[in-house]
From Swiss-Prot:
Pfam families: ABC_tran, DUF3744
Known function: Probably part of an ABC transporter complex. Responsible for energy coupling to the transport system.
Protein family (similarity comment): Belongs to the ABC transporter superfamily.
Entry binding sites for ATP 2: G328, K329, N330, G331, A332, G333, K334, S335
Binding-site residues for ATP 1, renumbered to this chain: G39, P40, S41, G42, S43, G44, K45, S46
Protein name: Putative ABC transporter ATP-binding protein gbs1680
Subcellular location per the Swiss-Prot or TrEMBL entry: Cell membrane
Stretches assigned to the ABC transporter domain: 5-246, 295-527
Biological source species: Streptococcus agalactiae serotype III (strain NEM316)
Length: 558
């Protein structure tokens, strides 16, 4: 069926805003197509998704003009009940989507609302649990699962409805690299088996393109900039111009002077012809030069039950000015490590800080030394307004109003939030809330800053601004610890990486060496970046190519 979903000259403006968020949108999506909606923060892509699933106009009110139809019916005339049977949404944060006390109850929720008979309901739940490989988890609490498992449960909970439209709102935001790849493969399989119209809203272009998409729609400032095949988009400079991270191999090939005009297929490195490509001389890997020890963690173990250690005898040192990545699969113990370092979780570790034993610190005393930004911003926010949230720590420490205003404005500008200084936090996106929490910790200037997934949900512009700011802090002597699933971040912006696997340190090395260890990557659910695949095709050292890439990106690493 042609034009299953259609926006024609469609404009939408929230009641609380003075300018339209969507401006003259013309977009048609045929039935069964798989479309990626791409764009920087604030571009309007999430608003488009909210129009599609009924959050607009049922929850978020506003004014619209033009035409928006689903299956040739005015979408805004459909009840939220009717819309729920047309569009199934998998949210960015699966914890916000769970209803049931067990996985089975959660999957069955939509069926219960439709008064499906118990026997049929059980059969449907078991069928989808088996297809999504979560059958052994049916009796578990959703909140106890890993990130990848949570996404599968969320997906099962919407697939039981058999809706013709599947909407994914940044499904990769909180997943380790291998789990993200697995989810994209699963989405592609479901798309093909169900013949569903599949719409993916996502920042991580390269990860989405791991599987085929029919079309990419690029948004900026509420307008469509590009609407076409991914291969053609990758030949343009639109991605870098509009704040979207290019696939690593595309950026590297541009720096190498590769002629894309003769290239038909851009989404697979295997399809490129490198016979005429000239390879410049490349230097050896930079070594970490940090030697001034700031923090020594000795024999850290954490157990949530009597049988298993979440962390088992973890020891490592952290140096002044060092940028350290903590990586590993979902559920490996990375966030537990951060919480233990901040005294949020009882532990018997010995901590030596600036040659002083601080193992008996209170939480308040530890906070003066180590700042921690949580992965989920909603768990940190306590104030209604952006300014008040960022200013709270300074107010509790007795700073003057003038000093508070000056410092808050400075940090908001750095974090790309100055224009929202008088906004209610409830009006911000997930990525914007994340920046608010980062700002609230950075303003206190702790010597060690731990950030749990600092760039999750951030577009390239704000990602680059944030990482450049963290680089400046490290140059000033701050030690930056980043818990991340982003292998490109680890490559470009850290000096060292620790891999956690099942509560143990599996590796502690330079990021490039970590990503060169195929056996380690497979074991710990990490994956090589496309630079390594490109190096294999070019027949050169992946370490040298990666160092060359970093040098040509402005020398951000080191």
């Amino acid at each position: 069926m042609k034009d299953f979903i259609e926006w024609k000259d469609f404009t939408f403006q929230y009641d609380v805003q003075s300018e339209p968020t969507l401006k003259g949108i013309n977009l048609s999506i045929p039935k069964g197509e798989k479309v990626l909606i791409l764009g920087p923060s604030g571009s309007g892509k999430s608003t488009l998704g909210h129009c599609l699933n009924g959050i607009i106009p049922n929850t978020h009110k506003g004014q619209y003009s033009g035409i928006f139809t689903i299956n040739h019916k005015n979408a805004f005339d459909l009840s939220i009940y009717d819309k729920s049977h047309l569009v199934s949404t998998v949210l960015q944060d699966p914890d916000g989507q769970f209803i049931g006390l067990t996985v089975a109850e959660d999957i069955a929720f939509a069926l219960e609302n439709d008064v499906v008979a118990q026997e049929e309901m059980t059969s449907i739940v078991e069928m989808w649990a088996k297809r999504l490989e979560i059958a052994p988890l049916l009796s578990k609490r959703p909140q106890d699962l890993s990130g990848g498992q949570k996404q599968r449960v969320s997906l099962a909970g919407v697939l039981v409805d058999d809706s013709p439209i599947l909407l994914f709102d940044e499904p990769l935001a909180n997943l380790d690299p291998q789990s993200g790849q697995d989810i994209m493969a699963l989405v592609d399989r479901i798309h093909q088996e169900q013949d569903a119209t599949t719409i993916i809203i996502e920042h991580r272009l390269e990860d989405v393109l791991y599987e085929r998409v029919d079309r990419v729609v690029l948004f900026s400032d509420g307008q469509i900039i590009y609407n076409g095949e991914p291969d053609q988009l990758l030949k343009t400079n639109f991605l870098s111009e509009y704040g979207i991270r290019e696939p690593l191999y595309i950026s590297a090939l541009k720096n190498l002077g590769y002629d894309f005009e003769k290239q038909n297929t851009m989404t697979s490195i295997d399809d490129f012809d490198f016979s005429e490509l000239l390879i410049p001389k490349m230097r050896a890997l930079d070594l970490d030069k940090h030697t001034d020890k700031l923090l020594s963690v000795q024999h850290l173990s954490v157990s949530y039950d009597l049988e298993n250690n979440t962390l088992d005898d973890v020891s490592f040192d952290l140096y002044k000015g060092q940028r350290l990545a903590i990586v590993g699969k979902n559920g490996a113990g990375k966030s537990t490590l951060a919480k233990a370092l901040c005294q949020f979780i009882p532990n018997n570790a010995t901590l030596i800080y600036n040659n002083e034993d601080v193992s008996q610190d209170s939480i308040k005393e530890r906070a003066e030394r180590i700042g921690y930004v949580l992965q989920n911003p909603n768990q940190m926010i306590s104030q209604a307004m952006v300014f008040d949230e960022v200013a709270l720590g300074l107010r509790l420490r007795g700073f003057s109003d003038n000093d508070i205003e000056s410092r808050v404005y400075d940090i908001l500008k750095v974090c790309g939030l100055y224009q929202f200084r008088n906004w209610p936090i409830s009006a911000l996106s997930f990525g914007q809330k994340k920046r608010v929490t980062i700002a609230s910790i950075l303003i206190l200037n702790p010597e060690v800053i731990i950030l749990d997934e600092p760039t999750a949900g951030q577009d390239m512009k704000h990602y680059t601004e944030m990482m450049s700011f963290l680089d400046k802090l490290s140059c000033d002597g701050h030690s930056i610890v980043m818990i991340t699933h982003d292998m490109q971040l680890m490559l470009e912006y850290t000096d060292r990486a620790i891999v956690i696997d099942n509560g143990l340190i599996a590796a502690d090395d330079h990021p490039i060496n970590i990503l060169s260890n195929t056996e380690l990557l497979k074991k710990t659910h990490l994956k090589k970046t496309s630079l390594f695949a490109l190096a294999d095709r070019l027949g050169i050292s992946p370490q040298k190519l990666t160092q060359w890439y970093i040098d040509n990106q402005g020398g951000k690493n080191g």
